[in-house]
Amino acid sequence: MSKNIYPVPTHIKNTALVDNDKYNKMYKHSIDDPQSFWAEHGKRLDWFTPYSKVKNTTFDKGHINIKWYEDGYLNASYNCIDRHLKTKANKVALIWEGDNPSQSEHITYQKLHDEVAKFANGLKKLGVQKGDRVAIYMPMSPQAIYAMQGCARIGAIHSVIFGGFSPSAIADRIKDSGAKVVITSDEGRRAGNCVPLKANVDEAVLQESVTSIEHVIVHQLTGGDVDWHDHDIWWHDLVADEEPVCEPEVMNAEDPLFILYTSGSTGQPKGVVHTTGGYLVYASMTHEYIFDVKEDDVFWCSADVGWITGHSYIAYGPLVNGCTQVVFEGVPTYPTAGRMGEVVDKHGVTILYTAPTAIRALMAKGDEPVASSHRNSLRILGSVGEPINPEAWNWYYEQIGKSNCPIVDTWWQTETGGIMITPLPGATDLKPGSATRPFFGIAPAIFDAEGNTLEGEADGNLVILDSWPSQARTIYGDHERFEQTYFSTYPGVYFCGDGCRRDEDGYYWITGRVDDVLNISGHRLGTAEIESALVAHPAVAEAAVVGYPHDIKGQGIYVYITPNEGITVSDELTKEIRNWVRKELSPIASPDMIQWSPGLPKTRSGKIMRRILRKIAANEHEQLGDTSTLADPSVVDELIENRLNR
C-alpha cells in the first residue's frame, strides 16, 4: 500500500466542478435521500415524457427487481445527438484516429446525426424493429458508433462483440441473444495487421446451430477480399438512398438499451442487460463529474466499444454531455511507443482515460513513450479495467502527466454500468493504487466470509448495499442466474466478486477477483471458459486454469494440463494447445504458461484445489497452507518441482 499522498492541485481545485466540501454534501444527500437526489439529477437528460417515479428497487431474495425512472420516456440517440444540434451542430463530436497515423477524420454532431439517421433507416428497411437484437462485431471505426446509435434510435437492442473474439465465441453470443442482424466490417486493422472480421462472422453464422440471423451488414473498411452470401449486404448500399432524417423511437426508461456479454465463472458468458433511462443518467453524470468535463475539453478513452468502458465512456456518456472525443482504432505502441503522446498532441487531448496494461506496456519502453510529444494539453488522467499498481501509477503521473494531472483511478464493472469508486479531481487527495471513495449514490461495505459487516480499517469482500441508476437489470433470458450470481452470496446486497481493503482514511483499495474470473489486461475471462476450450482438444484429459501476477498484463494465464494416455508431450504440442485456445476463444485467452502434469491436486471428493495451483503459479509454494485434505499429496511435489514461473 502506497504511503504517498498527492493533495488536490490548486490549479485544478480553483476550476473544478466539485471540491471536497461539495463532494461531502452531495454524497450525504445521495445516501440519505436517494429519491430526491436522483430526481434532481435525472433532469440532465431530455425526456419526451418526464418521470414521476424515481427509485423502485429491491434486493430481497427471490424478488430482485431494479427500476429507475420507470414512468419516463426518452430516446438514447436523441439525448446523444439531436438535443445538441441547436447549439452544437458544428461542434466536433468524434475525432477518429486511424491505426495508421496518417488517417484521421473529424465528425461534427450534425454529421453524426445524419450518418446515424441514414443507418437507422437502413436497419428499418431490413425489418429491424423495436426490441430486436442486433449483434455488432466491428473495429474502432466511426461506423461502430453509428451502428450502436442507429440501433438505439429505433429501439433495437445492440449486442457488441469485441473484435478479438473467435467465431465460436461470436456464435455463442448470437445464439444466446437471438440476434437477427450482424453488423461487421470486411476487415479490422490493428498494429499494421488486418483482422479477418467478416471471415469470423461467416464462420459463426454458417454454423447449423445459429438460426436467427437474417442479414449481415458489411462495412467496407480495408477493401480486402471477402466471401459473399445471400444474406450479406454492403453498408454503403444499404444507406445509399436513405434520408438523413429518422424520428427517434419513444422508449420507456426501463426498455433495454443493450446486452453486453461478460465472462462468468461457470463458463457460459452472461448477457448483462442495461436499460435506457437510469443508465444514461449515470453514464453521463459520472463522465462529467469524475473527469471534470468542460465545454472545450477533448476526451480520449482508449478502450474498445466491445467492452463496457467503450459503451459508457465512448458511445454514450460523452455524447450525452455534448463532448468532443477521440475514437482510436490502433494500439498505444504502434507504430512506435510514442504513439499515445503523439495522439494527445495532435488532437489537443485534455483528458486521457486508459488501462494499467497500456501504461505498463509503455513503462517497459524506457523514454520512448514520452520523447516524441510534449502532452502539455493534458489536464486529467484516468485509469480503468483493473487495479493499478503504485509503480505504474507513479510512472503515469510523472511521465505522461508531468506530475501536473490528477489521476482518477476508477473501479467499476460491466454489471455496474458506470464508475462506482473513484477520486474526483477537485475533491480527493490521491494515494497511488487506491480507488479512494464512492461516487454519489454508491454505498459500499466490506463483509467477511460469513457476511458480517467489517467497520473501519478492514480487508474482505466488497458489496454494495443499495441500487444505483445504471445497475444491470438482469442476465438476458436468465434472471435466476442474475440473482444467483450477484445476490445469493450475501442476501440483500449486491456482491461484486472483488476483494477490497479499506484504510485508516476510509479509502478503498481493490485487491482483485475472489471468484474464478481472471482479469487479463483489463479483460474479464472466466477460467471455466478457458478450461472448456482446453479439454475439447484431443490431447487433453484434464485442465485447470489460474491467474498469476504478470508485469504487463496484471494477471497472466497459467494452465495445468494432464495429457490423455499415450500422448507424448512436446514443444510442438504446447504451441498447438496455445493456438487452439486462441482459435476457440480469443487471442486474449491464450495461455502464458502451460505446465504438463500427470495429475492435479484434488480433495478426496474429487474437487481440484485451485488455491494450491494459484500459489504454485505465483511461485509462492512455501505458503501452500493446509494440504491435509488432498487425496494424493505427492502430486503437489511434482507440480512444485516442474513449475514454470520461478
Swiss-Prot record:
Cystine bridges: none
Any one GO cellular component localisation term in the record: cytosol
Post-translational events: Acetylated. Deacetylation by the SIR2-homolog deacetylase activates the enzyme.
Residues the entry annotates as binding CoA: R190, A191, G192, N193, T309, S521, R582
UniProt enzyme class: ligase
N6-acetyllysine: residues bearing it: K607
PANTHER family: ACETYL-COENZYME A SYNTHETASE
Keyword match Aminoacyl-tRNA synthetase: no
Gene Ontology MF terms in the entry: acetate-CoA ligase activity; AMP binding; ATP binding; metal ion binding
Family matches, as InterPro entries: Ac_CoA_lig, ACAS_N, AMP-bd_C, AMP-bd_C_sf, AMP-binding_CS, AMP-dep_synth/lig_dom, ANL_N_sf
Cofactor: Mg(2+)
Pfam families in UniProt: ACAS_N, AMP-binding, AMP-binding_C
EC number: 6.2.1.1
Biological process, per Gene Ontology: acetyl-CoA biosynthetic process from acetate
Residues involved in Mg(2+) binding: V535, H537, V540
Substrates-to-products reaction catalysed: acetate + ATP + CoA = acetyl-CoA + AMP + diphosphate
Protein's recorded name: Acetyl-coenzyme A synthetase
Key words of the record: Acetylation, ATP-binding, Ligase, Magnesium, Metal-binding, Nucleotide-binding
Binding site for ATP: G385, E386, P387, D409, T410, W411, W412, Q413, T414, D498, R513, R524
UniProt similarity note: Belongs to the ATP-dependent AMP-binding enzyme family.
